[in-house]
Amino acid sequence: RFTSQMAAALETGSLISDIKLGDFLRRRGVTVIPCVNPDGVEISLHGSAAAGEYRELVHNVSCGDTSRWQANARGVDLNHNFNAGWEALHTLEREQGIYHPAPTRYGGEYPESEPETRLLCDFCRSQYFRHALAFHSQGEEIYWDFGERTPEKSRLMAQVLAASSGYEMSEPEAIATG
């Protein structure tokens, strides 16, 4: 939806949150990666059969209900697989009895253990990004606070996004901060 709004604003010259996008993009760029976890989306929509070689694992881990599946086909929640607070999340997972692949919140054996996470991190390390935003349509919430690692303008950016998207600014529970 965000990229559609951007394209429409570019075509018509309209504003997004009081910003003329064409002028903005002449000075800056925007990189959009539409979906980091396509197999997870397919599993959530179409069940364990969409997991290919991992269908048995997905079926067993989900007990046949994949409607709330958030992990990749290997049962790793990619939001928990980045090397940003991974050790703390791993500890919280253990405290909640999460030791192995699961529909959500299992961060993998080590940070960037999953090809999706590793490729995204490699791409980001190869670029100079001043800001990074991650959109999650589930819940229609904007998480902007990351403790001591929260960038300076995060709150302001979240306020602009909330005003333009209708999503609520929110703080996730501790185990969901990945």
Question: How would you describe each model-predicted region?
Answer:
Residues 1-146, 151:
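Active-site/substrate-binding loop(s) of hydrolase catalytic cores
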Residues 109-110, 139-178:
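Catalytic cores of processing enzymes, dominated by hydrolases/peptidases
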